[in-house]
Amino acid sequence: MTVTKIEIPTIDLRGYYEPTSPTSKEEVVAQVRAACLEHGFFQIEGHGVSLEVQRNMLAACKTFFDLPTDQKAELSLYKNTWRRGYEGYGEQTPHHAVLPDQKEAFFVGRDLPEDQIGFLKGPNVWPEQVPTNQFRGPVEEYFEALLKLGHRVMEVLVVGMGHPPSILDSFTGNAAMFLKLLRYPEHTFTDPRVFGSGAHTDYGGLTILLQDPGKHGLEVYHAATEQWIPVPAVEDRFVINLGDMVQRWTDGEYKSNLHRVLNKASGERFAVPAFWHGDLEATNPLNPNDTSGETVQDFIRKKFYRDYSLPLAEEKGTAVAV
């Protein structure tokens, strides 16, 4: 039986933001909408994030993960309640997975003072032994660039749903976003159930993924043909996918799709997903007829605890991780 070859589309955003682009704004909007309807995934070029900022971010990943294990463990995210810091190998098992993920991670969010600690809110933690220009500086610069990119991508999404960009005013004013720096070891495991990241959906708004160029591994499930579609790791190209919140808030029109990672490269593989959720206090901007009053925080909080079998605890009293 012949298997239909499916690819995740690549879209040049310059057609939307640059008047001199040969692609029209309407074409870009239509391409993004089609990808959201079929895959819940698309790749973007012409995004406005400099190649230098991307390369510095990946170099910062290597700098951190090359630290001795005991130094990384000192920054464990289990030592705080707002999900910042280091997560070691095997410490996460996605809801749909059988075995723990074979990866290590480091989480960064908006850097807030301790008197503002709350659900997913608080200060970042940093490795003091690493010079600022080798880690914290590049990470913070990348964070700011991705905050802006998330806003731009969301604008294209809502225009594709027939809404004016202004509908996002309250949603993007103080958008919550989290970086998850990742290192996957070389895949030498013989158990076919072991993955760098097991099959899962993301449960927030947008995910914007930076991949280590040439280090392939991401696969997206295509239900209609029951196949896993490889998404290549190409320099200066981001992978965008929609989370469960977008699927819910569009009444299932836009997809939050299963995906997984199996490191197919020789040697280690780095990746940096940015989870861009919008303002935690904002309600649904994607469906003006939604009268539920559910906020971004309401949705994420429920998924956060349910998917990881954690009790509904007070954030200031119990350390939790996602």
Swiss-Prot record:
GO molecular function: metal ion binding; oxidoreductase activity
GO biological process terms held by the UniProt record: small molecule biosynthetic process
Gene3D superfamilies (UniProt xref): B-lactam Antibiotic, Isopenicillin N Synthase, Chain
Entry keyword Metal-binding: yes
PROSITE patterns: FE2OG_OXY
Essential cofactor(s): Fe(2+)
Binding, 2-oxoglutarate: R269
UniProt keyword annotations, A-Z: Dioxygenase, Iron, Metal-binding, Oxidoreductase
Cofactor note: Binds 1 Fe(2+) ion per subunit.
Conditions for induction: Expression is positively regulated by the cluster-specific transcription factor caaR.
UniProt xrefs under Pfam families: 2OG-FeII_Oxy (PF03171), DIOX_N (PF14226)
Pathway(s) it belongs to: Secondary metabolite biosynthesis
Positions contributing to Fe cation binding: H200, D202, H259
Protein name: 2-oxoglutarate-dependent dioxygenase caaD
Natural source organism: Aspergillus niger (strain ATCC MYA-4892 / CBS 513.88 / FGSC A1513)
